[in-house]
């Protein structure tokens, strides 16, 4: 086969033109489309990568916030638990304190009621004993008993000290002194109309029953020895006296009787009961204040 050079050149030129045409009108759009697609994919991948990074950052922030929230929740839960526990303890202590105060108040009230009842029983018992004693003495009072009372009165006068004798003398003559030697001797207000116009002191001695002459003489002697002066005596009977003797002189009266003992005993018992009641009330107030 003969090779024509022109034909070869023409074929080569034709081939080159075909290649250029293919590249210009066929391959270039395809390549451009491929490049554009590749660029779009790369852009989308870059955007996706950015979004992924943002998502990871957001996830990290979310997890961090969750951790912080959990920590704050634990702290708040611990704080609230401690506060609730402390409040519960405070309320329990307050309840126990209130219960103790109520119990103490109830016990004190019961103790006061018991003490009041006990004091009332004591007072009633003492009053009954004293009343019975007075009644018995009034029923048993007689001449023999009056003689013994006179002897007791004489012994008491003879055992007075100098100061007591001086006080008794002043009480009988001038009046106005306080009785400090015995609860059985009582100085009463002046009795109007007693005295002697002759200047000699007159002493009136009275008892529930008439005293024998011997007892009258003994009393007169003891009183003269006590007063150290001349006096006159009038002895009389006073039915209202219970086992006792009273002397009236210089406008004053000095009395000695078993009734005086009973009155002193009653006064002492009343004083002791009042003092005991005041002590109990003071202790109750101190306990309440301490609470």
UniProtKB/Swiss-Prot annotation:
GO molecular function, one term: proton-transporting ATP synthase activity, rotational mechanism
Family indicated by similarity: Belongs to the ATPase B chain family.
Subcellular location(s) per record: Cell inner membrane
Predominant location: membrane
Residue spans crossing the bilayer: 2-22
Quaternary structure and interacting proteins, as annotated: F-type ATPases have 2 components, F(1) - the catalytic core - and F(0) - the membrane proton channel. F(1) has five subunits: alpha(3), beta(3), gamma(1), delta(1), epsilon(1). F(0) has three main subunits: a(1), b(2) and c(10-14). The alpha and beta chains form an alternating ring which encloses part of the gamma chain. F(1) is attached to F(0) by a central stalk formed by the gamma and epsilon chains, while a peripheral stalk is formed by the delta and b chains.
Described function: F(1)F(0) ATP synthase produces ATP from ADP in the presence of a proton or sodium gradient. F-type ATPases consist of two structural domains, F(1) containing the extramembraneous catalytic core and F(0) containing the membrane proton channel, linked together by a central stalk and a peripheral stalk. During catalysis, ATP synthesis in the catalytic domain of F(1) is coupled via a rotary mechanism of the central stalk subunits to proton translocation. Component of the F(0) channel, it forms part of the peripheral stalk, linking F(1) to F(0).
Listed Pfam families: ATP-synt_B, OSCP
Record-linked HAMAP family: ATP_synth_b_bprime
Lineage: Bacteria, Pseudomonadati, Pseudomonadota, Betaproteobacteria, Nitrosomonadales
Record's GO cellular component terms: plasma membrane; proton-transporting ATP synthase complex
Keywords: ATP synthesis, Cell inner membrane, Cell membrane, CF(0), Hydrogen ion transport, Ion transport, Membrane, Transmembrane, Transmembrane helix, Transport
Domain of life assignment: Bacteria
UniProt-recorded name of the protein: ATP synthase subunit b 2
Record's bilayer topology term: Single-pass membrane protein
InterPro entries registered for this protein in UniProt: Alt_ATP_synth_F0_bsu, ATP_synth_b/b'su_bac/chlpt, ATP_synthase_B_chain, ATPase_OSCP/dsu
